[in-house]
Design a protein with these regions (language model features):
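Single conserved hydrophobic/aromatic residue that forms the stacking wall/gate
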Residues: 1-9, 14
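Active-site metal-binding loops of divalent metal-dependent hydrolases
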Residues: 10, 22-24, 52-53, 65-67, ...
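Metal-dependent catalytic neighborhoods of phosphoester/phosphodiester hydrolases
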Residues: 10-11, 20-43, 136-138, 174-179
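Conserved beta-sheet core of the metallophosphoesterase superfamily
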Residues: 17-19, 132-193
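Short catalytic/ligand-binding loop motif for oxyanion handling, primarily in non-cytosolic enzymes
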Residues: 26-28, 56-61, 69-72, 132-135, ...
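A conserved beta-strand/loop element that lines the FAD pocket in flavoprotein oxidoreductases
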Residues: 46-49
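Beta-strand-turn-beta hairpins that frame and shape the catalytic cleft
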Residues: 53-63, 122, 177-182
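Active-site-proximal loop/helix segment associated with metal-binding centers of metalloenzymes
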Residues: 62-124, 129-140
Length: 193
């Protein structure tokens, strides 16, 4: 990844909206400290948004982490293989698969409701996790860890009013189209302080 942290909040970026990903909660941050719907402005023009809709002109931006749904058959492998379960807290305890899946349900319910209720001419959904397995890197297509990265909503997206779905988290930039929705990868990468 090429990371240019000096751009975030600079004069080159008028307004930055950041969707928190799993790494924003590492080092034992508690996911529930802020709840499942919040915004946090850490500069006048830069902020994190979780399960929020922002209207700009005639476009609704639906912003959500969209935690993925862990496949029951892969729970053990995901729990053992992903640092999230050793680095993130949920209500004071280390995150477990059950809470991960509960957060997923909260996020997808928010996204679906926001898209359904939108009166904007255009809808852009921005998530951290992937909305479809179609954008998993081909070299990882059969990985037991895929459900920690993506949930399958291709059929719903194809029949939705969503114009663009922007995602990150995949470690590989893959763009595609599902129905009339452009699915675009825009991940920032890691910032090491």
């Amino acid at each position: 990844y090429e990371v240019m942290p000096s751009l975030v909040g600079s004069e080159m970026c008028i307004r930055d909206r950041i969707v928190p990903g799993n790494h924003e909660y590492y080092n034992y941050s508690d996911v529930m400290e802020r709840g499942m719907q919040w915004k946090w402005m850490f500069r006048e023009n830069v902020g994190f948004y979780q399960n929020q809709v922002i209207r700009i002109d005639d476009t609704d931006f639906v912003l959500s982490t969209l935690w993925s749904r862990i496949n029951p058959n892969d729970e053990y492998f995901v729990w053992k293989g992903m640092n999230d379960f050793r680095q993130i807290k949920f209500d004071g305890k280390l995150l477990q698969v059950e809470e991960f899946n509960r957060m997923h349900e909260t996020c997808i319910d928010f996204i679906r409701k926001s898209v359904e209720e939108s009166t904007a001419g255009h809808i852009v959904v921005v998530t951290h996790h992937l909305p479809t397995l179609e954008v998993i890197d081909p070299q990882h297509k059969n990985s037991v860890l895929n459900s920690a990265f993506a949930s399958e909503y291709g059929d719903w997206i194809a029949n939705s009013r969503i114009d663009i779905w922007i995602y990150g988290h995949s470690h590989t930039n893959i763009d595609t189209e599902i129905g009339s929705t452009k699915v675009i990868c825009n991940q920032m990468g890691y910032i090491f302080a």
